[in-house]
Amino acid sequence: MSEQKAFSLNVDEQNIAWLAIDVPNEKMNTLQAAFADEMKEIFAQLKDSSGIKGMIIHSLKPDNFVAGADVRMLEACTTANEAQALAKQGQELFQQLSDLPYPVVAAIHGPCLGGGLELALACDYRVCTDFDKTRLGLPEVQLGLLPGSGGTQRLPRLIGLLPSLDLILTGKQLRAKKAKKLGVVDACVPDTILLDVAKQFIDKGKNKGKKKQSTKEKLMSGSGLGRKLVFEQAAKKTNQKTRGNYPATVAILEVIQHGLEKGFAQGQELEAKRFGELVMSSESKALRSIFFATTEMKKEHGTDAQPAAVKKVGVLGGGLMGAGISHVTVAKAKVPVRIKDVSNDGVLNALNYNYKLFEKQRKRRILSKADLQAKMLQLSGGVDFTSYNHIDVVIEAVFEDLDLKQQMVADIEANAKSETIFATNTSSLPIHKIAEKAERPENIVGLHYFSPVEKMPLVEVIPHETTSDETISTVVALAKKQGKTPIVVKDKAGFYVNRILAPYMNEAAHILLANEPIEKLDGALLDFGFPVGPITLLDEVGVDIGAKIMPILVNELGERFKGPDVFDILLNDGRKGRKSGKGFYTYKGKKKEVDKSIYKLLKLTPESKLSDNDIALRCVLPMLNEAVRCLDDGIIRSPRDGDIGAIFGIGFPPFLGGPFRYMDQFGLKELVEKMNEFASKYGDRYAPCDGLLTRAGEGRTFY
């Protein structure tokens, strides 16, 4: 039996060559180094075939073109030179494609990303479908890399410098119509006529006219001076976002500029060189580990039980969390939702919240007016339990009050089916206590979302001791359909994310009360790689929420969670954070600035004494210590889950790979030494936990 191949070539009676891509035993087409020999065979066949009029490259997969290069092959590289050789191999193959003497058309249906788009860019024309899953982009930067098979050179020459920089530096993915508008593709058509339209492009011949440039593009990148300005501005803007933590962005700018100034061949040469270096960088290795972890997690259900089908969801509470949960259920999971609130106003607020989010998508032409109406028809609500006897999963998002949540359990058990799952979105109450009076405790589980629900990618799934395996697997499957990455955590105070966040926030308060200025404190953690500083985070979450959660953690987990007494002082002065217009900062619209009167209120005289690095480490080390305790206490199932939880739940710097990967990189022995040094200076709260001491002493790592 002959071995299945990823590429097959046929020439039809019209002398059009059809190159079909179908990677065997894989759901998605990805490009692999092992395919190089196949491609060489294809080129040899093409050379031997006379009279070919043109070639169309298409996929035999039902819903994807090429999702990118197979990232796994980078893990086999032990040196930058090996990775550079991979890039060069890709460049050479695509150059051969580009050099064919007849027109080549890429017929794209579904994702066309990374190496897939680089393949398409090497063709003369690109035609794509208007299918919802058709996406085009070069997302390599999100793995700490740059496009290594000609993407940095071909895209700017096709669509111009300004839009190319935006696409390559962000890794954003374009929908089909936007790709057509930018000139990435030449046509966007229904999938039923994709191949017919591709054939029409063969008749246009090999030499395609250059894309017409906008006046702005001509002015900004048409001259050496304009280009210099563009690159300076792009570097400045990018550095403001990355704060120097992502070397790939610097390399991208350098390689594109080099190619435009020195020519295509030299541009490709530097592209391959920088690609090789980036593959071996700690930042890319960390970002790739996140990619592998999330890919693994997509295949897991939390237990071995099969998830039950979820055809309708109920949401209790029409507040911010309830509205967000209902939105991801309808928009992403495509499951209808019934919202129950104590007042009609609450239901209307949730419906209005959803309408505004869908309307934003309509304005961006992601949804049509008919799509918007269809989505809104999937949402209904009321003040009673009408139709709750048809609901499979109820997600409770009411006020954080134990009696109220227990009452919700009783109401659902009285009004829903016996197998209906009750998932509580509590952030601080133990799940076993919410389930204490339940008739069917096996149906009760924690499902902790993060705010704003439609943006935050993590959800914590918290079974209590008698939660059934089917309940766990069903809510894990639902969370994934909602576009979330779920981690299963143990039912203990703070669960995982809030438990590791608390010591970090407490330490920020200690530093503030030692007179460090607020902007210095926040800036140090931004430079470390967090998306927002700890003081800003407290304002965003709400000082009142912090005041509620901290005492619970102290009560359940001990004095190490006791922070400085600042909450009452702030709340008595009406400072709840952004939602009340002032906290540590004052807020006017989207603008915020440090409220200088806070220093007087807290009897402080701001004066910068600590280095940025010391501030960052003082906040981060207690978080790392607590993460190890969570692993050893069984709160999280693995270092992998702990890393993903911290990155997706609180924005731990992705380029560090998460708390556990960062500790391995830091060195556990060195980490223990640093903690002991801080413990002698600032107190026992820095003393390394037993798990850290043991691992450091035995020379072990987490991975």
Swiss-Prot record:
Localization (cell): Cytoplasm
Entry GO terms, CC: cytoplasm
Pathway(s) the chain acts in: Lipid metabolism; fatty acid beta-oxidation
Residue numbers spanned by region Enoyl-CoA hydratase: 1-190
Site (Important for catalytic activity): 118, 140
Keyword Nucleotide-binding: no
E.C. code: 4.2.1.17, 5.1.2.3, 1.1.1.35
Main location per the UniProt record: cytoplasm
Alphabetized Gene3D superfamilies for the sequence: 1.10.1040.50, 2-enoyl-CoA Hydratase, Chain A, domain 1, NAD(P)-binding Rossmann-like Domain
UniProt keywords, alphabetically: Cytoplasm, Fatty acid metabolism, Isomerase, Lipid degradation, Lipid metabolism, Lyase, Multifunctional enzyme, NAD, Oxidoreductase
Catalytic activity reported: a (3S)-3-hydroxyacyl-CoA = a (2E)-enoyl-CoA + H2O; a 4-saturated-(3S)-3-hydroxyacyl-CoA = a (3E)-enoyl-CoA + H2O; a (3S)-3-hydroxyacyl-CoA + NAD(+) = a 3-oxoacyl-CoA + NADH + H(+); (3S)-3-hydroxybutanoyl-CoA = (3R)-3-hydroxybutanoyl-CoA
Chain spans, region 3-hydroxyacyl-CoA dehydrogenase: 308-703
Coiled-coil spans in chain: none
Pfam assignment, any one: ECH_1
GO biological process: fatty acid beta-oxidation
InterPro entries: 3-OHacyl-CoA_DH_CS (IPR006180), 3-OHacyl-CoA_DH_NAD-bd (IPR006176), 3HC_DH_C (IPR006108), 6-PGluconate_DH-like_C_sf (IPR008927), ClpP/crotonase-like_dom_sf (IPR029045), Enoyl-CoA_hyd/isom_CS (IPR018376), Enoyl-CoA_hydra/iso (IPR001753), FA_oxidation_alpha_subunit (IPR050136)
GO molecular function, one term: 3-hydroxybutyryl-CoA epimerase activity
Function, in words: Catalyzes the formation of a hydroxyacyl-CoA by addition of water on enoyl-CoA. Also exhibits 3-hydroxyacyl-CoA epimerase and 3-hydroxyacyl-CoA dehydrogenase activities.
Subunit organization: Heterotetramer of two alpha chains (FadJ) and two beta chains (FadI).
HAMAP family assigned: FadJ
NCBIfam families attached to this UniProt entry: FadJ (TIGR02440), PRK11154.1 (NF008363)
UniProt similarity note: In the N-terminal section; belongs to the enoyl-CoA hydratase/isomerase family. In the central section; belongs to the 3-hydroxyacyl-CoA dehydrogenase family.
Protein name listed in UniProt: Fatty acid oxidation complex subunit alpha
Name of the gene this protein is made from: fadJ
